[in-house]
UniProtKB/Swiss-Prot annotation:
PANTHER family according to UniProt: SPERMIDINE/PUTRESCINE IMPORT ATP-BINDING PROTEIN POTA, SPERMIDINE_PUTRESCINE IMPORT ATP-BINDING PROTEIN POTA
Reported function: Part of the ABC transporter complex WtpABC involved in molybdate/tungstate import. Responsible for energy coupling to the transport system.
Catalytic reaction(s) noted: tungstate(in) + ATP + H2O = tungstate(out) + ADP + phosphate + H(+)
Recorded family membership: Belongs to the ABC transporter superfamily. Sulfate/tungstate importer (TC 3.A.1.6) family.
Matches recorded under PROSITE patterns: ABC_TRANSPORTER_1, ABC_TRANSPORTER_2
UniProt protein name: Molybdate/tungstate import ATP-binding protein WtpC
Domain ABC transporter: 3-232
EC numbers for this chain: 7.3.2.6
InterPro entries for this protein: AAA+_ATPase (IPR003593), ABC_SmlMolc_Importer (IPR050093), ABC_transporter-like_ATP-bd (IPR003439), ABC_transporter-like_CS (IPR017871), Mo/tungstate-bd_C_term_dom (IPR008995), Molybdate/tungstate_ABC-ATPase (IPR053428), P-loop_NTPase (IPR027417)
Record keyword Transport present: yes
Membrane topology designation: Peripheral membrane protein
SUPFAM superfamilies xrefs: MOP-like, P-loop containing nucleoside triphosphate hydrolases
Length: 330
């Protein structure tokens, strides 16, 4: 493994990290996913050596780097604002770390040209950062970080300052860059899109704790707790008594995909629910007729407005798995 974080805790202003432990494998794109205020950036800055932890250790390729200064850690950190040097050209920004390391001039030129070609910024090398778009600044920051061939690239909300169109395009390009350049990345974000599109594994951070770590598909389909499930979008939590593959809840008999027993709670994703005002033919396991009453938000000329909607509907939903409770199956 490239990075091992063991038991990191830190009280920093209003942020609190609590016993954070995880590892990043070579060539992996590891995502720390959490809401604003969860402590994601503080964790990244502790790993980078900008903030000193209160307890815990950090290892890079088996070496304890906890007490090393940032420049001795073999890491490259890209903050959310990219931190380009405004008085330098794009070429000199990318070359900065190489010049500090006294790399020969010819090698610097070769490296800058190679990276700028892969990242699509060859035409920008003579320009200053103030003339660049957000997407262009991000590419320059990534090139500058990768120029020094770090063991690990630390990315702090790398797409947060970009418009939706640019963000979608650069997320796709990030996949290509990693394939072509072969870097290892630790990436913090609040975006589900980034986690699903880029992550090999994801760690969910809530209130300063890393509460679940695993492959992206596994974490999103099998959250380890109700807290994680709600963060990941399981808005409908139903509690009832399970016996085998049957859950009895609120007068309903619900079929489960696996066996369970005792009192449990299950989560139903909004996208797993289908409504129809006609009799519904569906392969979904659970079909009911019910009356739906809801507030429906419409976007009008003067902004959003809310009206009441009421009617009888046929509905169907599937439950992918029981979520929580002593009787929940594995």
């Amino acid at each position: 493994m490239v990075l091992m974080v063991e038991g990191i805790s830190k009280d920093y202003r209003e942020f609190h990290l609590r016993d954070v432990t995880f590892s990043v494998e070579k060539g992996e794109h590891f995502i720390i996913l959490g809401p604003s205020g969860a402590g994601k950036t503080v964790l990244l800055e502790v790993i980078a050596g900008i903030i000193e932890p209160d307890s815990g250790r950090i290892f890079l390729n088996g070496e304890d780097i906890t007490d090393l200064p940032p420049e001795k850690r073999g890491l490259a950190y890209i903050p959310q604002n990219y931190a380009l040097f405004p008085n330098m050209s794009v070429f000199d920004n990318i070359a900065f770390g190489l010049k500090v390391r006294k790399v020969p001039k010819a090698e610097i030129g070769r490296k800058v040209r190679e990276l700028s070609e892969v990242l699509g910024i060859s035409h920008l090398l003579k320009r200053k950062p103030k003339t660049l778009s957000g997407g262009e600044m991000q590419r320059v920051a990534i090139a500058r970080a990768l120029a020094v061939e770090p063991e690990l690239l630390l990315l702090d909300e790398p797409f947060a300052n970009l418009d939706v169109q640019t963000r979608g395009r650069l997320i796709n390009e990030m996949k290509r860059w990693r394939k072509e350049l072969g870097f290892t990345a630790l990436h913090v974000t609040h975006s589900f899109e980034e986690a699903v599109s880029l992550g090999d594994r994801v760690g969910v951070m809530l209130n300063g704790r890393l509460v679940q770590v695993g492959p992206v598909r596994e974490v999103f389909s099998r959250p380890a707790s109700e807290e994680v499930a709600k963060f990941l979008g399981f808005e409908n939590i139903v509690e009832g008594l399970a016996e085998g593959r049957i859950l009895r809840a609120n007068g309903l008999v619900i079929e489960l995909p696996i066996e369970a027993s005792g009192r449990i709670r299950v989560g139903i994703r909004p996208e797993d629910i289908v409504l129809s005002d006609e009799p519904l033919k569906s392969s979904m396991r659970n079909t009911f007729q019910a009356e739906v009453q809801a507030d429906v938000e419409e976007l009008g000329e003067l902004g959003p407005r809310t009206r009441k909607a009421k009617g009888r509907w046929s509905g169907a939903f599937s439950i992918r798995y029981p979520l929580f409770g002593a009787g929940a199956g594995a």
